[in-house]
Structure formats: structure tokens, C-alpha cells
């Protein structure tokens, strides 16, 4: 099998000692019933809540303790193209087989979950999760079908001011919610933006991650634009694991509040 970057994955047996360097995918592994096989996580793997107390924390998503990972004797390491650096992937590949995910839309999400199910011998649960997400997405699309299109700017960082571009999973979910990203095609995935772009939006969404935007930042942006400023939970817009099972309820509530 190949991972989503086309790298060959060669496993001698079904993995029993997994290290995951992607917070959203750590949550996914647990929801697939694989918590007992999970031995190492990052400091940002905050879901489930007490997991970090039960597993070995091996660093962050951009900086790892390779010695800690090696000491765990993992037989499978899960990374992500966007969350982790190429250097981290190369270091981990010297320790155990590494699967690098690259999830930019629902099709790549479904493909990844099926891969995980096959590699980790939990395919029935993986297929059930995919089917549930597909059904929930279908229902959500029906509920927002009559929503007006709203121009939106989704901010992820403050200094410099940065937004989610169109080639992101965040943008896919914005579109599903009836939003149109004011970032132009061809820009980087997370371009720097200026105050002029703020003025083109009907709504400016302040994400709770990676920069921890909160209510205290709203007034500052209200002086720069007539757009409605709203704080949103970034996990529901950017976590592409089993968090999607809860995301559509969150989006429905958000759209109700906007209306």
C-alpha cells in the first residue's frame, strides 16, 4: 500500500504500537477503538481529554523528541503533510513505517480512513465511520441548500494577519456552510492578508487555533471593517478525523446564530 504522498508502506504485521503526531488523527484512532495500541502522542493531542496522561508525549507537531519515539519501539507512525515537517517524517521513517496523510477534501478523507482501516485491521469500523460522515454531510447539504452565499474571511493568525486560502480543508467546510472565501484562487494555502481584504468580507471568522483568537479580539477588528466578526471553534473547521461526526451540528448552530 502507498500513503497519500505515494510513499510505500511495508508492514510485517498489523501494527500494535502506534505513535500519532497529528492531533485530529489521534482522536480518530481512539474513535476507531485503537486506544490500547496508541503508545505515543503530541502535546497538542487534547482529545480525548485525559489521553496525554495515559500515553507518552513525544513533543509537538513541528518538533519531536526522536529518542522518546524510538524508546517506545513503535511499529507504525502516523504523520500529516501539513501538520508535520518533511524532516520529522524522515526521522520517523528511520524508526518505523510512516504513513503520511494529505487530506484536502472529503474524498481524500474517505480514502485515508479506508487506508487506516486496512492497515490497522479495523476496516468495518472505518467503513461505518465513513458511511456516517457521508450521511451526515448529505443531510447538512439539504439543510443549508437555501442559505444565501456570504463572503467570508477565515483568520488563523494575528501577527502577521493570516487566513485560510482556497486549497485547504477549512475552505471545503466553509463552502459547505454556504460561505464564499474572499481569498483569490492561486494564493498560498495560508496567505498573509491586509485590512483591505477585511473590507471585502461580509463575515470575518476568528479561529480558536492555531492562534487563540477570542472575544477580546473582536473590537479590534470592528474598527477595520463593517463585516460581522465571529469567533469560531477551529477544531470543527480544521480537524478532519472523527471530529467531523460532531462538526455538522456545530455548523448548524453557527448558521442559526448568524441568521
Mark where each language-model region is.
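N-terminal ligand-binding lobe of clamshell/alpha-beta domains
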Residues: 1-259
